[in-house]
């Protein structure tokens, strides 16, 4: 459930608080009136499982979920319908609720504090993740959430009015089957990712049936672990953080292999981006909209990349968000200024009356996303249970290991260098140059990834759970069903894309999260291994320490 929520000028009936007999999940809105969450307009719905929505706004990730309610004056408020639906969801106390409501015309919402696996898992990683430490003692039963009646606006009213005008303009093109594109832009920390989710929610509420997100923010990816550029069709509102809506398998995704772009790889980045935008034009339905999630990098190489993105997609609308007037701004150059909306976002964060907590660093955001991706495999909502997840067994002969040039080691260290590592699972590409490890046919193939390597289509991620040299097997834990693949995927390592440290430290019994089964040197099996059991060496590119 959410950690905190802001409510504007509303009459709220929280059934779980006042009438504990209700038992519904996870967030539910119905009856008459009008309500929106993060600018997604909630429909008036019946009590069915498919109508539930999950919301999530952890205190440690700054912005609250914003709930706005109002009365729709165009239609008469139907207390009889409200009574019927209350009887359906709370048969033992619906009459008491109706008596409490009286002649008022509220929007009625049901909360349930049940966490899904992803949020329950990540909340166990960070102290006071869901709710502020100063109000923990006020709440008796976990998981916690807090509701505040602050008049909190992220976007100024004038800027929001201009944005709505442009969105209505694009919406008018939808009826003619025109495919449109929107490009949100913002410097680091400006709130671009939240803006992107907000645009998705607005489009879904404005009648768009086909909303796509082209996610090219390789450092803070939305639907995949970092390092990927992907195209995703969004069918439900985005009311939580990336760790909560990770896809198990990817239909249209390429593994870029790093969390940043350097001079040598801009062409590779733009090649992948153009492939996916062409894919959008090919597979999307008439009247679709594509929202591009760009990187929070608007100067130097970042500006060059944005120039390229604008040339490729020719956006129908650019939305630039900024919080700090001293930060550099993107120069739109020849782009039509009439298609640009500038938003100076609210600089305040959190809930009034609560002291600010230390902001989570970007590397930890990425680790939480990876944790959320693998959470669907866990038998219990804790990383400590990762050791119980059964892995897939892949034969040496059928796999290809791909390493970036900077992570390349001698053949005798290859298995040690990939063990316990996070790897991208990619479709085999005939243009990829490979060789057999140590020149032996019963060993894996090896490929060195450089600037000349082809773009690799990514179908998911995995963690190397173990290497058994004697049995010639690699064990991989992944949400992807490898049994349904026609051939084993490529095992591709990326730069600065690693298994979160919590996977090694969360188990209270200190069980090893990996297995490296090597033969005894005196055994007959070792005669043909040529030193492949050499001890591990450090292949980490940088040292980091953090406190949170």
Curated annotation (Swiss-Prot):
Keywords, comma-separated and alphabetical: ATP-binding, Kinase, Nucleotide-binding, Nucleus, rRNA processing, Transferase
This protein's name: Polynucleotide 5'-hydroxyl-kinase nol-9
Gene: nol-9
Enzyme kind, highest EC tier: transferase
Protein family: Belongs to the Clp1 family. NOL9/GRC3 subfamily.
Keyword rRNA-binding part of the UniProt annotation: no
Physiological role: Polynucleotide 5'-kinase involved in rRNA processing.
Lineage: Eukaryota, Metazoa, Ecdysozoa, Nematoda, Chromadorea
Any one cellular-component term (Gene Ontology): nucleolus
A GO molecular function held by the record: ATP binding
Ligand binding (ATP): 186-193
